[in-house]
Amino acid sequence: MSDSEYLTRAEAALAAIERALDDTDADIELERSGNVLTLEFENRSKIIVNLQPPMSEIWIAAKAGGFHFRFVDGEWRDTRSGTEFFAALSEYATQQAGEPVHFEA
């Protein structure tokens, strides 16, 4: 994947997260600084989603751990488990919010 393809796909993922948070009733604050999204929950815990252009990856840091995602076969997939990005982010956010939170592309 070229650098421009990576950036287009990765930016689309960040935009999908922003849209989902606009539509949710969960109390999650969103801050964007460049290629980094910070989701802060009511309990003050955070999830950090950041782009890693040199690696062509998206990284998530959550209470559950650190995870790297690479674009494979049309989806962002965890480089270790193969879990789809939005499914994983939904799970981590649900755990930290204490209520269902859903993200999708």
Swiss-Prot record:
Xref: SUPFAM superfamilies: Frataxin/Nqo15-like
Metal-binding listed as a keyword: yes
Biological process, per Gene Ontology: iron-sulfur cluster assembly
Its job: Involved in iron-sulfur (Fe-S) cluster assembly. May act as a regulator of Fe-S biogenesis.
Sequence similarity: Belongs to the frataxin family.
One of the record's GO cellular component terms: cytosol
InterPro entries noted in UniProt: CyaY (IPR047584), Frataxin/CyaY (IPR002908), Frataxin/CyaY_sf (IPR036524), Frataxin_CS (IPR020895)
GO molecular function, one term: ferrous iron binding
SMART domains: Frataxin_Cyay
PANTHER family in the record: FRATAXIN, FRATAXIN, MITOCHONDRIAL
Primary gene name: cyaY
Keyword Hydrolase in record: no
Name of protein: Iron-sulfur cluster assembly protein CyaY
Keywords: Iron, Metal-binding
